[in-house]
Amino acid sequence: MQDVKTYLSTAPVLATLWFGFLAGLLIEINRFFPDALVSPLF
């Protein structure tokens, strides 16, 4: 179990999860607000 916890806390795994989440968020924002130069959410 310790090995799995160590693996899941490494930088490549965390970076992959973060960039995947960020890409999904940007895709959804562009789906609801297409061609927006400034996000209307802020």
From Swiss-Prot:
Record function comment: May help in the organization of the PsaE and PsaF subunits.
Residues annotated as transmembrane: 7-27
Lineage: Eukaryota, Viridiplantae, Streptophyta, Embryophyta, Tracheophyta
A Pfam match: PSI_PsaJ
Stated name of the protein: Photosystem I reaction center subunit IX
Biological processes, Gene Ontology terms: photosynthesis
Primary localization: plastid
Keywords: Chloroplast, Membrane, Photosynthesis, Photosystem I, Plastid, Thylakoid, Transmembrane, Transmembrane helix
Compartments (UniProt record): Plastid, Chloroplast thylakoid membrane
Protein topology in the membrane: Single-pass membrane protein
InterPro entries: PSI_PsaJ, PSI_PsaJ_sf
GO annotation, cellular component aspect: chloroplast thylakoid membrane; photosystem I
Similarity comment text for this entry: Belongs to the PsaJ family.
Coiled-coil segments: none
